[in-house]
Structures are given as structure tokens and as C-alpha cells.
Amino acid sequence: MNSPLRRLSTPTLLSLAVALGLSGCAGLPDQRLANEALKNGDTALAEQNYRQLADLGYSDAQVGLADIQVNTRDPALLKQAEATYRAAAQTSPRAQSRLGRLLAVKPDATEAEHREAEELLKKAFANGESGTLIPLAMLYLQYPHTFPEVNAQQKISQWRAAGYPEAGLAQVLLYRTQGTYAEHLDEVESICKQALSATDICYVELATVYQTRGQTEQQAALIAQLRSAHAAGRVNAQRVDSVARVLGDSTIGTPDEKTAQQLLEEVAPGYPISWVTLAKLLYDFPELGDVNKMMEYLNNGRAADQPRAELLLGRLYYEGKWVPADAVKAEEHLKKATATEISAHYYLGQIYRRGYLGQVYPQKAVDELLTAARGGQNSADFALAQLFSQGKGTLPDPVNAWVFAQLSLASETPQATELAQAMSTQLPPEKLATAKDLLAREQKVRGASATQNAMAMQALQEEKDGEEAL
């Protein structure tokens, strides 16, 4: 790293020297402390130290600060992160890599930004930066029209033939993106067994493989290995949380919710996000605890400023399952989660659409549901189609009803199919051309599917977590 001291003025150097002389190391920003705090989920302490070092000109600390902003997934903070990466990229190859990775998953990015991302990632890869092939592969997979000259599978095969360590994981990502993961479990297992010691995201992939197959002995051995690696500091709490989510996922083979709960309770005191994961696990498996346990988990998560805790608490008041239904409290908690949690917009939209606050608020419902739909919540398209077809609180709009009914087909549910057929019947023939044009425009606004964007953002996060500390 280029020494930031060379770029500081004499008065600044003098002030820094005086501070060092008067206080020694006590109270001074500490990058190692920031790294450890971030690894353990204490983003406030990490941000405090990174920010102070970043203000002194340390490019690695600037990158660390931007990483925290990226982790929030808050649109406003993502813009700040992009600006921070750009500023640091003038002297830091790591920042160049981060900028490329962020542009690769940036919502509503332009074709020029995607091309810039490719250039930055290729440059970073040539400079030996890790974590570049996964977002590069995602670029090619998500935006084939921008890169018509690139065949993603051929490119990944070339990387694997050249022996690049990340290439195997790029292949796994391709299977996930194309929906063929279940057809390649043997290959995923082989790739991740070889890469496990170097890339801990493979704990998640192997847990998925073993749970899908129902291989309980292999799963138990993997969990024991994970616990040992975490105790030794080789695997962070976030990875343990990710594995626990697989164990508690009822859509993947036969879940092991009790082991998931044990893992999460082990790491939650030092990794507050896991309190919310515990609450969601209890929501899915009520036999694991009672309402008091649920509130304990959620209050711990809220105390650590976790938006997902606000989302889940709002959902509880919305549904009236664990606590008495209360639309006012639901709205209050859901609003606190909207900056980072797309689902919060969906539930708010439903509150306004269904009149849970005493009357229907059609425009508020449309605004919230459209935000949710464009963020990847397929059920929001279905709700919008219902709103425009039923005309509850507003006049029926058969054109908009048809458009959102067509978009809701992505959820592949019988209800969506039935609604789409009904809307096609009700749409006047002379308005079909207008409806198709509106559908095309809405699809263009959404660009790459939000599900893929979410997957890409997750890939960015997972790859970054696998790197060495800044």
C-alpha cells in the first residue's frame, strides 16, 4: 500500500505526530481492530475505525468503509460506496476490483457501466486480485446482449482448464443461475470438497448438496468441521449463519432445524444478524420455541439495528400469528425496514390495498407494491393485478391489470395463471396493443431479473467475505 503519509501536509503530519506522542496507541483508529469487528458483525466499531483511517487517506480503509456501505444494500449508501471506491481506485488495485464488482451488480446499470465493470474486473484479475472471476461470470450470465461475443460456459471452462481457483465456483454459480444446480450435485460436491480449505462458501454448497440428497452422516461431519473451523477463527460467524439457513430451509431436502438453531445460538451473541435468523427459523418451525423466545430473538436483533428484525416483527403484527394483529404497529415496524428489505414494501402495499388501517389507500398501495415488484417480489405483481382488476378504492384498470397479471406468471403459481387468463378475457381487444407496449416498457425498466440481481449481490458479498482482511 502506498503510504498515505506522503500525501499529508506538514501541519497534518505534525498533528498526527502529537497525537501519537500524547496518547500512544490508546484511542487511535486501528485497522486490525476494524477488520476483526467487521468479521464479528460489529459494523459500528468497524465503521468508526475505518472512517478515521479513511479520513487520513488510507485507501485500504476507504475500501473497508465502502464495503460496509455495500453490505447494507441501502441504495443511498450504495451510491456512496461507488463514489468511495472510485476515489480510492486511483491508487488501490483492490478498490478497482471492488468498483468493478459493484458495477457488475448495480441495479439499473447502463451498458457502458457493465462494459466498465468488465474492464475493471479483467484488469484486477491480471493484477492478481482475488474475487474477480465470479462477478465477471455473473456479468456474462446476466447480460448476454451486452456481451454477445462471450459464451459464459466456454469462458468458465477455459478458466477451469487454466487452473484458476475461482473457476470452479463460477461453474457452481452458472448452475444456480440457470436453474440446473440439482442436476449437477456430484460436480458441485467435487468442486467444493477440493476448494473447502481455501473458500469457505463451500460449506454452504456442501450443506446444500448433502441435505438435498438426505446424507445425514456427511452433513453431521461437515457441521463438526464447520464448528471446529469457526472455533479456530478460520471461518467467520456469517458463514455459520449461512449454513444454518440451509439447514433450516424446508425447500432443500429434509431440514435439520434443531441443529440450525444450535449453530445460530452459538454465534448470535457476537454476530447480531443471527438473532434475526433465529427469529425467522422459529417463525418457520414454531415447535422450537414460544412467543417469548420469538420476542427475545427479535429484541436482540432490533437492539443491534437489524432491519430484518423490524421486517419480521412488522410481518408478525400484519399476520396476527404470534401476536394479535395490529396494522398500525405493523406499518410502524415495516417502514423502518424499507431502506434495505424489499419485502417490507410488499407488506405495506398489502396493508394499504386491503384497508387494514381503516380505509383503502390505492396510490400508497401502488407505490409500495410496484417498488416490491421491481425489487423481485413476484407476489407483488399478483397483488397489483388484483388491485387494478378489482378497483377497490379506485376505478378498475383492465390494461394495468393485464400487464401485472402477465408479470405475475413468473411466480409459476396456479393462482397467477388463473388470474392472467381472466385478465386476458376481460381486456378489450382494441387495448391489447397498448397493454403489450406497457408490458414491454415495464420489463425494460426492470432490466435483468431482480432475482438475478439479488443473487449477484449475494455473490459479491460471498466472494468479498472469502478474501483476506484488508
Curated annotation (Swiss-Prot):
Keyword Membrane (UniProt): yes
InterPro entries: Alginate_biosynth_AlgK (IPR053440), Sel1-like (IPR006597), Sel1_AlgK (IPR050767), TPR-like_helical_dom_sf (IPR011990)
Signal peptide range: 1-24
Lipidated positions per record (S-diacylglycerol cysteine): 25
Record has Iron-sulfur as a keyword: no
Membrane topology summary: Lipid-anchor
Known role: May be involved in the polymerization of mannuronate to alginate.
PANTHER family for the chain: ERAD-ASSOCIATED E3 UBIQUITIN-PROTEIN LIGASE COMPONENT HRD3, SEL-1-LIKE PROTEIN
Name of the protein in question: Alginate biosynthesis protein AlgK
